[in-house]
């Protein structure tokens, strides 16, 4: 479950509670559109957190999120693109 991974990753890179909640909302919205199943939960959580950081103005890179989650930057980038497209996000 990617939602359970959000606090684990967030604690490693010190993001706000507000940003964590935003990431959880991104994941829930993606789940409604069936864009989460079959994807690595850690990669999905990292990408949702990256999107939330951008939206909340927290300066974190894809590399920061990838390292905190133990996934590659390519995974974060691919999930980010997928989420952005499915949710019509302007980030």
Where are these regions (language model features)?
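A cyclin-like helical interaction fold
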Residues: 1-43, 50, 63-69, 73, ...
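Short, amphipathic alpha-helical "recognition" segments used to contact nucleic acids or chromatin
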Residues: 45-57
């Amino acid at each position: 479950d990617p939602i359970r991974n959000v606090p684990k990753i967030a604690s490693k890179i010190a993001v706000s509670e507000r940003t964590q909640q935003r990431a959880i909302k991104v994941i829930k919205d993606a789940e409604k559109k069936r864009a989460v199943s079959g994807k690595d939960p850690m990669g999905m959580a990292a990408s949702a957190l990256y999107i939330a950081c951008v939206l909340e103005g927290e300066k974190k890179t894809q590399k920061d999120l990838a390292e905190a989650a133990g996934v590659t930057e390519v995974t974060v980038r691919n999930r980010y693109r997928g989420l952005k497209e499915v949710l019509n996000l302007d980030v």
